[in-house]
């Protein structure tokens, strides 16, 4: 999580969010937390992480995975096993973050409001004509739906965890002798020539008698199993199957508009300015100066403790309802344009508020929103009808459990039939974890009964499926005739490999003895240990071979294709420390990850983590 937070703080996306400074800095300084008290999801050393925080983190992670995996993510999330793992990963992430937060507190690490303000004021995102633009920053905050305290906590946490990350980075080091040894081994080069004996070519030259095939069959009969197979009837039902049946009348649209006019308005905005003061006495002095005619902007610039808005004469820009604390907005709403309030206490500061201008709510005309309302009503009616029909189909599947014909008739769709298949080769239409579980883990495959309604869609595209096993073929041992062709290939492969290995071993013996032998080696090539993943079988042999002295060393092995290979090791060149720099940064990052994981493991071992099991169970 620290690495991820560290990456986020250096990404463009995070810098945009980071620049959306919390209005709590304007009003009260650093915010106090993401959310208020709520039913807990988990308690970490007595500190509550509520269900709202869990759901927010879950939604954020869903968005990330949806962007990476698309529809496949929602299909995975529909499976109980994956959903359980996903929810646990979200919970673990929140617990880890809280442990790090508490660890930072124990270390007396902290981020001041001035540190965050400095970052924001100097951010290019909110610079206009080379200066910080308060209205631009306020506008971006509103557009992103961020609350003051919520964003303050995010910024504070991000900078705090970055401090810990910096500590981990600075505590991780390696001595030159270690780097020299790693360079020598990881970047070691081995110059080889290879002689390849293709297995496929030799297999084509082999024969296998019926007696040999029968002998293999008798010895390996229990391994020659035909897995259970099914032929499945199924019905798939989606909202689009009944979309053409949904009609929306003009009367419905007009009625909806009248009942929901409040939803079809351009929300009003208020242009505000304020002077923030540390105590009541100072606030009264400034209020009196205003009554005597002193300019509001000048007083804000000279006396306001909110340094950001003070530079703008107290200007907070245009704001919508819900941005400021309730008492602040109530006071502003009671003012006329150009009217100034008496000092009002908001948290630990006093504010004198001025309304510079106001834009009232503007109702959107019916014709402008008509198409939108039609879609809203159509979608609601469609989902309602889809739900009703799905329920009716489920009842019919239960009442007449030996056929799907009437189930399909209710929805106006067809019963489809699969080809014969086993669990390793699921047809695309049935390749869903819920369907596979219903077919293979229960009694359906032998009972011939209809399944329950299976929800195989996702939040954006609902889909219901019913399945029934029409034909069931149990697992059985294949007959000799059925397995004969496969056995023939196996026997021929074994013969070919034995022959090639014997030939290669004989040639290696001759080469080691210095005798002339006809081996067709290819041109020399250089293999580097750090790239062993390219051909692990070959590399394992090459880098385990004895180093050559005055002549090459030889050994028999295989390549990834199964061919038999003679390796001639010509030369070994150790890696140099100066070439190690690119790898060093990767290894350093890995070491830091391991250090962070060890730290979390230690913190968890000493922590009290109380999970709300009832809440977690409800998520399944």
From Swiss-Prot:
Residues 1-15 are cytoplasmic. GO terms for cellular component: plasma membrane. GO terms for molecular function: peptidyl-prolyl cis-trans isomerase activity. The chain crosses the membrane at residues 16-36. Keywords: Cell inner membrane, Cell membrane, Chaperone, Membrane, Transmembrane, Transmembrane helix. It comes from Haemophilus ducreyi (strain 35000HP / ATCC 700724). It is found in: Cell inner membrane. InterPro entries: PPIase_dom_sf, PPIase_PpiC, PPIase_PpiC_CS, PpiD_chaperone, Trigger_fact/SurA_dom_sf. It holds the Pfam family SurA_N_3. Belongs to the PpiD chaperone family. Residues 37-620 are periplasmic. Interacts with the SecYEG translocon. Binds to the lateral gate of SecY. Forms a complex with YfgM. The keyword Chaperone applies. Its main location: membrane. The lineage of its organism: Bacteria, Pseudomonadati, Pseudomonadota, Gammaproteobacteria, Pasteurellales. This is Periplasmic chaperone PpiD. Residues 267-357 form the PpiC domain. It comes from the Bacteria. It is a single-pass type II membrane protein. The keyword S-adenosyl-L-methionine does not apply. Chaperone that functions as a gatekeeper on the periplasmic side of the SecYEG translocon. Facilitates the translocation of precursor proteins across SecYEG by interacting with the translocating substrate. Also plays a role in the release of newly synthesized secreted proteins at the periplasmic exit site of the Sec translocon.
């Amino acid at each position: 999580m620290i690495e991820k937070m560290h990456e986020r703080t250096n990404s463009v996306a995070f810098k945009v969010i980071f620049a959306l400074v919390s209005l709590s800095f304007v009003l009260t300084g650093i915010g106090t937390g993401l959310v208020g008290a709520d039913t807990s999801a988990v308690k970490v050393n007595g500190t509550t992480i509520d269900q709202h925080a869990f759901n927010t983190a879950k939604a954020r992670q869903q968005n990330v995975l949806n962007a990476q995996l698309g529809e496949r993510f929602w299909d995975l999330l529909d499976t109980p096993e994956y959903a359980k793992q996903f929810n646990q990963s979200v919970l673990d992430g929140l617990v880890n973050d809280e442990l790090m937060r508490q660890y930072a507190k124990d270390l007396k690490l902290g981020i001041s409001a001035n540190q965050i303000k400095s970052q924001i004021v100097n951010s290019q995102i909110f610079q206009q004509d080379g200066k910080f633009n308060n209205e631009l920053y306020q506008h971006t905050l509103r557009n992103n739906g961020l609350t003051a305290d919520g964003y303050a906590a995010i910024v504070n946490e991000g900078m705090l965890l970055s401090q810990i990350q910096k500590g981990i980075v600075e505590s991780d080091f390696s001595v030159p002798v270690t780097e020299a040894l790693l360079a020598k081994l990881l970047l070691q080069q081995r110059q080889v020539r290879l002689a390849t004996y293709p297995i496929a070519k030799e297999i084509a030259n082999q024969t296998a008698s019926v007696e040999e095939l029968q002998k293999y069959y008798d010895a390996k009969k229990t391994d020659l199993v035909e897995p259970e197979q099914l032929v499945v009837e199924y019905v798939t039902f989606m909202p689009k199957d009944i979309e053409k049946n949904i009609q929306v009348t003009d009367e419905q649209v007009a009625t909806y508009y009248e009942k929901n006019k409040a939803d079809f308005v351009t929300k009003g905005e208020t242009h505000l300015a304020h002077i923030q003061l540390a105590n009541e006495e100072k606030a009264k002095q400034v209020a009196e100066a205003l009554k005597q005619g002193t300019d509001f902007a000048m007083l804000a610039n000279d006396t306001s403790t909110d340094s950001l808005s003070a530079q703008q004469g107290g200007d907070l820009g245009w704001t919508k309802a819900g941005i400021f604390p309730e008492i602040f907005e109530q006071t502003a709403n009671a003012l006329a344009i150009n009217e100034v309030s008496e000092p009002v206490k908001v948290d630990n500061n006093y504010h004198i508020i001025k309304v510079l201008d106001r834009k009232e709510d503007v109702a959107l005309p019916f014709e402008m929103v008509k198409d939108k309302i039609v879609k809203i009503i159509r979608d609601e009616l469609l989902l309602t009808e889809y739900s009703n029909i799905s329920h009716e189909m489920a009842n019919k599947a239960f009442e007449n459990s030996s056929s799907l014909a009437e189930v399909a008739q209710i929805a106006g769709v067809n019963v489809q039939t699969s080809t014969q298949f086993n669990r390793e080769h699921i047809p695309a239409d049935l390749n869903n974890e819920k369907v596979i579980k219903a077919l293979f883990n229960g009694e359906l495959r032998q009972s011939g009964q209809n399944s329950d309604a299976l929800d195989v869609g996702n939040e954006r595209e609902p889909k219901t499926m019913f399945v029934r096993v029409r034909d069931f073929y149990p697992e059985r041992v294949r007959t000799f005739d059925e397995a004969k062709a496969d056995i023939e290939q196996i026997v021929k492969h074994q013969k070919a490999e034995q022959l090639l290995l014997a030939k290669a071993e004989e040639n290696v013996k001759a080469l080691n003895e210095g005798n002339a032998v006809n081996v067709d080696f290819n041109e020399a090539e250089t293999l580097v240990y750090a790239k062993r993943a390219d051909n692990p079988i070959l590399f394992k042999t090459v880098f385990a071979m004895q180093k050559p002295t005055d002549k090459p060393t030889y050994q028999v092995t295989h390549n990834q294709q199964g061919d038999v290979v003679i390796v001639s090791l010509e030369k070994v060149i150790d890696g140099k420390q100066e070439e190690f720099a690119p790898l060093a940064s990767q290894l350093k990052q890995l070491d830091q990850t391991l250090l962070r994981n060890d730290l979390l493991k230690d913190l968890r071992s000493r922590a009290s983590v109380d999970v709300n099991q009832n809440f977690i169970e409800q998520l399944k």
